[in-house]
């Protein structure tokens, strides 16, 4: 499963990993969008390596997690040098520690580790299935509300159960950066740009898009305010409001 950054659709097809393994490929999963929002089972996915970041799951910035098959990690060389990643050092050579220490050189980010652990415990207490259900509820509200604004085009599935609580969209006649500025003035934070997915935007025939992200703490009233601010931005630049 992977929740794509831009179109926010959930890809759960186990065949992808099987096809990759049939030709000897290593399956690397970027799960930064998925892990905070739904149950993820690395074994069921068929992943060889899976990575995600801390700041998308209520944790701090500057820290992430890499899970990997031990046999694969054991074959990989270190990418940084420093304390803890060395086993034995001689003038003529050295050997490296076993994973995970081989990949954790130097002083670890102690405060970030502690904070990420607390965040993970909190999410585990809430329950990932419950979070996924809440994400679907919020997505449904956003899709319905944004769909009522003239000129708004949703990117990705319009079925809330097929996506997360993040919705990307465009507004006819309004550049995302302009809409973002107007909405910011009304206390609504969205992202405008290509969201690290420029090739996808080119594929869709658009230069950039807006992205509204919700999470378990988002309220229905905040979704209503988002929709109202999008409608206001469109009216500001091209005129016309929702009926």
Language-model features: locations:
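Conserved small-domain helix->loop->beta segment predominantly found in fold-type I
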Residues: 104, 123-175
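Alpha-helical scaffolding segments of alpha/beta enzyme cores, especially the outer helices
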Residues: 15-18, 22, 118, 137, ...
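Single conserved hydrophobic/aromatic residue that forms the stacking wall/gate
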Residues: 1-11
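Catalytic PLP-binding core of fold-type I/II PLP enzymes
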Residues: 12-48
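Active-site C-terminal subdomain of aminotransferase-like
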Residues: 58-62, 67-134, 140
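Hydrophobic beta-strand scaffold residues
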Residues: 27-28, 154, 190
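PLP-dependent enzyme catalytic core of the Aspartate aminotransferase-like
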Residues: 112, 117, 180, 185, ...
